UniProtKB/Swiss-Prot annotation:
Keywords: DNA-directed RNA polymerase, Nucleotidyltransferase, Transcription, Transferase. The keyword Transcription applies. GO terms for biological process: DNA-templated transcription. It comes from Synechococcus sp. (strain WH7803). InterPro entries: DNA-dir_RNA_pol_bsu_ext_1_sf, DNA-dir_RNA_pol_bsu_external_1, DNA-dir_RNA_pol_su2, DNA-dir_RNAP_su2_dom, DNA-dir_RNAP_su2_hyb_sf, RNA_pol_bsu_bac, RNA_pol_bsu_CS, RNA_pol_bsu_protrusion. DNA-dependent RNA polymerase catalyzes the transcription of DNA into RNA using the four ribonucleoside triphosphates as substrates. The lineage of its organism: Bacteria, Bacillati, Cyanobacteriota, Cyanophyceae, Synechococcales. In cyanobacteria the RNAP catalytic core is composed of 2 alpha, 1 beta, 1 beta', 1 gamma and 1 omega subunit. When a sigma factor is associated with the core the holoenzyme is formed, which can initiate transcription. Residues 1072-1097 are annotated as: Disordered. The gene is rpoB. This is DNA-directed RNA polymerase subunit beta. GO terms for molecular function: DNA binding; DNA-directed RNA polymerase activity; ribonucleoside binding.
Length: 1097
């Protein structure tokens, strides 16, 4: 295939840096966030006020990380840097100042690709979307159908304050969901007189009722108000005026306990039209009075007051890595502060130094906890470059301080008009997380306040101004403008052509003349996410199928020989580059050296820059990471040019699958219900062969009876089984292993107690030689095979950190080539997925008039009801492109160039292809897009013409090799004694309620009985049945299932007198077969067989 690519639509497809959201946030943390946190804790004073400890936050420094990224991955270490900060200890009495640089902990650093290496594994911190701090006005209906209004002041941290109106026109306030307090009681407690409040309100007559109500309760002074406040907030404690004063002060006016944050202050100022400076982050009297005033205006429906929509993106903000990390550092410093205060009090004042006061442990623990176990710190999805990129751009509403799946209603998950150009309306998971986990749109960025912005071109007097940089608007700013879509037709000068333009204004659609348009959207792609924007002809697909297509592209396995799509969207190059999977030239220069492992570029000054390539490394998902050079020695390169292809890349573009010849027709029922019929060519030519690398690990531990040994001398193992092991008993690199082969030989000492006297005598004569050991080697699990590509040995002597009790750890990496086979899952880019049902010899496949057999036969019934017609456009466009020997880039939403544009474009291309000599059969005007296929088995043409073409098809990571599973005897659950579930637990197949109904309907009583008893949880019965099978005797009658006993016990624990009786009325003791000191074997016990037990034959 030639590398020329024809761009069909002329839309700007350059995108901003796609990992910017991660990098910029971490950079902010290092430059500002960390300093801010350190300085907010300074100074720490002891309880007597004599000593003060100051952190000089701006003078913190980071040491060089101990290991670089590759080394950290290899050693299972964390890629982190040590933090040092200058501390000053001031003695107030003597005026003495001690200054010292103190170690305060390790900070994991972000790699260039926006990830973190924690304990050797690459992790990503997902962005979280939460409700923005600020003031929110809502209305509620009481049970009589009357509307009441309320206002909540939500801080970044601290107590919530909620004002409410009621049916008697009284104002109340709640602090943190406690009991209602008359609003005027709070005003008086804050030291405001009646006139102070009344002067501030635009409609004081409404408020006077609340003043009267407070007076009626006998609360007329500040002291009485403080007492009342204390009673309501701390019921059951003796109230005091000073207590009330302190409570109010700490709850709302103490910066340590109450913080609106920059965002909260900005939002409150904006909503209530205040001008309080950014630095005031606690509540002020002005905030409270303005909130009351706004609430009264809402109640009276005057003064332009409006309610807030909490799902609007102007009221939700994104917390990225930097801020999440900052919050975690605050938790650590809080714990540290307590320790420092205690040490100041306990220690000798004169001899104390800052280093003795500061203990790095709490901060280290807080940071470790965040990266290791937070819901937002996730194991990176590395299946392919797109999966990696999408993971870094993910935005989750779950996590600490966010929503939970169970509580999230429909409104939160729904698409909101303000998502336009900010969050993708398509890419979200199916299932319980739908709508809670979103993806950032292609052009969106997060501003300094954490609100998502999207770019527009300015429009003046009906002319689109495309000079300079576009203007970024956040959701609440955009609401006030009239915004036209990106596909409005303009002339060469930028003047809008139509008389009336559809625009979005205040979350509604209207049509206005061009002069009234304020902004135009940048590109049609800016509404959707990166994964969705890789789907060609997206506009012809139903949204549900586009969602599946976006999600399945992330599950495509990198193939042995990737191939770029014939029909792309023009964003493939940037996705490959920004994912970090492809090495990029850092300078302008010339390539001076290339081999499989390194590329050297010499810049204009004559300095060499080396780029080392990844070779056959294992990804987090066991796929293979490998880089192949695409430049040659002597090639000139420029900054930013791709030097090598990564996994699932070709020619610097992302290439997730293969372009294969597809026919839409039924074939002997083999493509019923989305099944896929494929040609043997895909297997033989390795089109869909992928490399998977599995990691096996074994540790030699210190046991009570002595150390385990990694050795070649394994008892009762034939010499030929040891052929591939080296002198230490470890497999050699390059060996081919089958299931059951030894990878690492290991022996464990056996117990001494069970030794007969003659053994002891031999031991005494020949010394320790005859020591008893057990074979405990690492073997290749069943169903696995492959070639050993790497062996790593970790010991204490080399300075590796090993788990407690281990003397040595050995890791073996085995790579396997997996060809495509029946049971594997495949999919196109339009949500058209299926399982391979049969692999047909190529001579039996239907073939084209020129004799080419097709590669895949899909069911045509998969298209109409699912409404993903994009696949048909792709098919025919690919057919034309393949015959014209070119590649095509189709930008989504091309109907801006005229109605039915996609169809016209495809038809034009097909006619062009048919003009070539000998290719006129490609396009039949009577049946455009269809060909007469011939049956490979009989040589007869098929009845009807068939749609045939080239489509980009992916092999997904759900491989049948990893799913197929069988169980003979295995572990049981502790309580119910039923077999466990799942392949990892060696589980059984669940026989559920519906399966039981099916057997009941057939009257298959004995089959059903044994399925529910001896094959499941009748403990005695299953042991007896096993012995009977081994000895060849008839299987005894089943007993009582364990789960029935559990049910009986549960009913008895509810206080019900329930028991089981025989027909004669005699009670059955269910526990008779259970030993009182029952230690159930979790596996069945085999009785030893005597000679007499064997049958004669």
């Amino acid at each position: 295939m030639s590398s020329s690519a024809i761009q069909v639509a002329k839309t700007a497809t350059y995108l901003p840096d796609l990992v910017e959201v991660q990098r910029a946030s971490f950079k902010w943390f290092l430059e500002k966030g960390l300093i801010e946190e350190l300085e907010s804790f300074s100074p720490i004073t002891d309880y007597t006020g004599k000593l003060e400890l100051h952190f000089v936050g701006s003078e913190y420094r980071l040491k060089r990380p101990r290991h670089d990224v590759e080394e950290a991955k290899r050693r299972d270490a964390t890629f982190a840097s040590q933090m040092y900060v200058t501390c000053r200890l001031v003695n107030k009495e003597t005026g003495e100042i001690k200054e010292q640089e103190v170690f305060i902990g390790e900070l994991p650093l972000m790699t260039e690709r926006g990830t973190f290496i924690i304990n050797g594994a690459e992790r990503v911190i997902v962005n979280q979307i939460v409700r923005s701090p600020g003031v929110y006005f809502k209305d509620e209906q009481d049970k009589n159908g009357r509307r009441t209004y309320n206002a909540s002041v939500i801080p970044n941290r601290g107590a919530w304050l909620k004002f409410e109106t009621d049916k008697n026109d009284l104002l109340h306030v709640r602090v943190d969901k406690t009991r209602k307090i008359n609003a005027h009681v709070l005003m008086r407690a804050m030291g405001l007189s009646d006139n102070d409040v009344i002067d501030k309100l635009r409609h004081p007559e409404y408020y006077k009722k609340s003043i009267e109500a407070a007076n009626d309760e006998g609360i007329s002074s500040e002291d009485q108000a403080l007492l009342e406040l204390y009673k309501k907030l701390r019921p059951g404690e003796p109230p005091s005026v000073s207590g009330g004063q302190q409570l109010l002060q700490t709850r709302f006016f103490d910066p340590k306990r109450y913080d609106l944050g920059r965002v909260g202050r900005y939002k409150i100022n904006k909503k209530l039209r205040l001008t309080i400076p950014d630095s005031v982050r606690t509540l002020t009297h002005e905030d409270v009075l303005s909130t009351l005033d706004y609430l009264i205006n809402l109640e009276l429906d005057v003064g332009g007051a409006s309610l807030d929509d909490i799902d609007h993106l102007g009221n939700r903000r994104v917390r990225s890595v930097g801020e999440l990390l900052q919050n975690q550092v605050r938790v650590g410093l809080n714990r540290l502060e307590r320790i420092i205060k205690e040490r100041m009090t306990v220690g000798e004042t004169d001899s104390l130094t800052p280093a003795q006061l500061v203990n790095p442990k709490p901060l280290v623990a807080a940071i470790k906890e965040f990266f290791g176990s937070s819901q937002l710190s996730q194991f990176m999805d590395q299946t392919n470059p797109l999966a990696e990129l999408t993971h870094k751009r993910r935005i989750s509403a779950l996590g600490p301080g966010g929503l939970t799946r169970e509580r999230a209603g429909f409104a939160v998950r729904d698409i909101h008009p303000s998502h336009y150009g900010r969050l993708c309306p398509i890419e979200t998971p199916e299932g319980p997380n739908a709508g809670l986990i979103n993806s950032l749109a292609t052009h969106a960025r997060v501003n300094e306040y954490g609100f998502i912005e999207t770019p527009f071109w300015k429009v003046e007097n009906g002319r689109v101004l495309k000079q300079g940089d576009p203007i970024y608007l956040s959701a609440d700013l955009e609401d006030e403008c009239r915004v036209a879509p990106g596909d409005v037709a303009t002339d060469s000068d930028g003047a809008i052509l139509a008389d009336l333009i559809p625009v979005r204004y205040r979350q509604d659609f209207e049509k206005v003349p061009p002069e009234q348009v304020d902004y135009v959207q940048l590109s049609p792609v800016q509404v959707i996410s990166v994964a969705t924007s890789l789907i060609p002809f997206l506009e012809h697909d139903d949204a549900n199928r586009a969602l599946m297509g976006s999600n399945m592209q992330r599950q495509a396995v990198p193939l042995l020989r990737p191939e770029r799509p014939l029909v792309g969207t023009g964003l493939e190059t940037q996705v490959a580059r920004d994912s970090g999977m492809v090495p990029i030239s850092r300078v302008n220069g010339t390539v001076t050296f290339v081999d499989a492992t390194a590329i050297v570029v010499r810049d204009e000054e004559g300095v060499d820059h080396s780029h080392y390539l990844q070779k056959y490394q294992r990804s987090n998902q066991d796929t293979c990471l490998n880089q192949r050079p695409i430049v040659r020695q002597g090639d000139p390169v420029i900054v930013g040019q791709v030097l090598a292809d990564g996994s699932a890349c070709e020619g610097g573009e992302i290439a997730l699958g293969q372009n294969v010849l597809i026919a839409y027709m039924p074939w002997e029922g083999y493509n019923y219900e989305d099944a896929i019929l494929v040609s043997e060519r895909l297997v033989n030519d390795d089109l869909y062969t992928s490399v998977h690398i599995e990691k096996y690990e074994i540790e030699a531990r210190q046991t009570k009876l002595g150390p385990e040994e990694i050795t070649r001398e394994i008892p009762n193992v034939a010499e030929e089984s040891l052929g591939n092991l080296d002198e230490m008993g470890i497999i050699r690199i390059g060996a081919f292993v089958e299931s059951g082969d030894i990878l690492v030989g290991k022996v464990t000492p056996k117990g001494e107690s069970d030794q007969p006297p003659e053994e002891k005598l031999l031991r005494a004569i020949f010394g320790e030689k005859a020591r008893d050991v057990r074979d405990n080697s690492l073997r290749v699990p069943s169903t696995e095979r492959g070639r050993v590509v790497d062996v790593r040995i970790y010991t204490r002597e080399q300075g590796d950190e090993l788990p407690p009790g281990a003397n040595m750890v050995v890791r073996v990496y085995v790579a396997q080539r997996r060809k495509i086979q029946v049971g594997d899952k495949m999919a196109g880019r339009h949500g058209n997925k299926g399982i391979i049902s049969r692999i047909l010899p190529r001579e039996d496949m239907p073939y084209l008039p020129d004799g080419t057999p097709v590669d895949i036969v899909l069911n045509p019934l998969g298209v109409p009801s699912r409404m993903n017609v994009g696949q048909v456009f792709e098919l025919l466009m690919g057919w034309a492109a393949a015959n014209l020997d070119c590649r095509v880039k189709v930008v989504p939403f091309d109907e801006m160039y005229g109605a039915e544009k996609s169809q016209q474009t495809v038809e034009t291309f097909l006619k062009e292809a048919a003009k070539q000599p000998g290719k006129e059969w490609i396009y039949n005007p009577d049946d455009p897009g269809k060909l007469q296929l011939i049956d490979g088995r009989s040589g007869e043409p098929f009845d009807q013409p068939v749609a045939v073409g080239y489509s980009h098809f992916l092999k997904l990571v759900h491989l049948v090799d990893d799913k197929i599973h069988a169980r003979s005897t295995g572990p049981y659950s502790l309580v119910t004694q039923q077999p466990l579930g799942g392949k990892a637990q060696q589980g059984g197949q669940r026989l559920g309620e519906m399966e039981v109904w099916a057997l009941e309907a057939y009257g298959a009583a004995y089959t059903l009985q044994e399925l529910l008893t001896v094959k499941s949880d009748d403990m005695q019965g299953r042991n007896e049945a096993l012995n009977a099978i081994v000895k060849g005797k008839p299987i005894p009658r089943p007993g009582t299932p364990e789960s029935f006993k559990v049910l009986m016990r549960e009913l008895q624990s509810l206080g019900l007198d329930i028991a089981v009786f025989t027909d004669e009325g005699k009670e059955v003791d269910l526990m008779q077969d259970v030993n009182p000191r029952r230690s159930t074997p979790s596996r069945p016990t085999y009785e030893s067989l005597g000679v007499a037990d064997y049958d004669e034959d």
